[in-house]
Amino acid sequence: MVSNQIATPTDPAVLVTGVTKPDSSAILNVDESVGNGKETVTTEWGFPRSKGQSLSYWLQQVRDDELLDHRTTEELPEAADTVIIGSGITGTLVAKYHKQNWPDKSVVVVEARDFCSGATGRNAGHCKPDQWRGFGKYEKQFGSEQAMKILQNEQDTWEALVAYIREHNVDCDLWVGDTLDVPMDAETASLAKDVFERYRAAGGKVDHIKMTSDPEEAARITRLQEAKACYAWPASTLQPRKLTAHIMRVNLAAGVNLQTFTPARSVTPYEDDTKAEGKGERYRWTVHTDRGSIACTDVVHASNAYLPAYEPSLRGLIRPKPHMCNKVIPPLAFAGSRALRHSYGVLLRDGSLFSINPRHGADGVVMFGGSNPGQRKLDEVGRRTAGGGPAVRRRRALFGEGKEGRRRRRWYGGGAAGYGRGAEVC
C-alpha cells in the first residue's frame, strides 16, 4: 500500500517553477533518480495528515510506548529559549546537543502527530555511509576538496552513531557488518568504476572497501544473478524509532519539554518589545500552533518535507517526494543458514537504487527501501492505493515466487522525504 503522508493544504496546491537541480554526469545516488539533470519542479506542499496515515512497521512495534502521545506539561509553554519543530532523529538530536551545550536554556519540541511518526519512523533503517559513490556528483558541484569532506562527514557520523549505541547499550536492533553496492548492468558498473577510481586518485581512502569487478564472483558474493560488480564496506542497520526514543528520554530527563499532537502552523517575528524574562535579551520569534503560541529566541526547523507548509519562503526549495518502504518475510530459500548476511544498495540505470536491510539478530524480516525505477510513477499514484507492479516483480526476482512467496509479501506503507537542491533534507 502506498499512503501519502502529506495532507492537502487549505489553499490550492502551490505551483513552483524555475527551481532546478544541478546536473551531474555521475548518477549513482538516490536523490538524483527522481529527476536527472536540470528540470523545472512543479510541486505542492501540505501539513501532516491528522488521520488516515499509514502505520509503519517501526511504529507498529511501539504502540505501548508512553512517548507516543507525551506532553511534558499539560499546557503549552508560553515562552522558551528554543523551539524545535519536529521530533524525528534531527529534532531529537538537536535537543540533545542543545541541552549539553546550554543546560540552563529552555527547549520545547513540538510534534504535529505522535512522537517520531514522520520520516524517521518510516525509513528502512539502513545506516550506510557513502564511501565513494557520491564523489562524482559532489566534485562537480563543490570541487574535489569539499567532495572529500562530505564523504568523510558521512563516515564520521556513522562511527559516532555506532559508538553512541554501544556506549549507552541502546536497544535498537543494531547490526554492524558489510554493506554491498551492486551495479546490475554494464553501464552502471562502468560508471561506478569510473567514480571509484576518480575518488581513489583524488586521495580518497579505499583500503577498507573490497571491490570485485568480475561479474561471476560478484554474483556469488551478492547472490544476485545479474550483478556486474560489488563494492563492500562496513555499515549498519537498526530500528530508527527505538534509537530516537532512547535519546528523547535522555532529553526529557535533562529538562526538554516535548509536546506531541501540536502542529506548528506558522513562525512570525515577535512583535512585543517586552524582554525575555530574566534573560536580558528580546524574543525574536513566535511559533503558532493549534494549541497556542510560543515566544522564543531561536527556532530550529526539523520537520523535513513539511517545512514549506508553514514557511512559505522555502516552497520550491524543499519539495516533498513520496517514497515507499516494504517489509518482506523471507521464504525458505533466504531463511536460516541461507538468510541474507549483508545489507545492499542495488544500483540500477538512471540512478535508481534499492536499499535492502535484512534485520539480522532481530525478527529476520527484510526491509526494502531506496528509490526504485518506478519512482516517477509513485509520484502519480501517491494519493491512492496501488498494487506493487515493477516493485513486486523485482521482489520475485530476488526471493522467487510460488505460494510461499505470494503469501509472505507485506507492504508496510510509505512516507514523504524532503528534497532540496541535490541533497536530502534530514
Task: Kindly label every feature range from the protein language model.
Residues 2-82, 100-101, 105-106:
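Extreme N-terminal leader/targeting segments of oxidoreductases
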Residues 198-202, 224-297:
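Helical element adjacent to the flavin cofactor pocket in flavoenzyme catalytic cores
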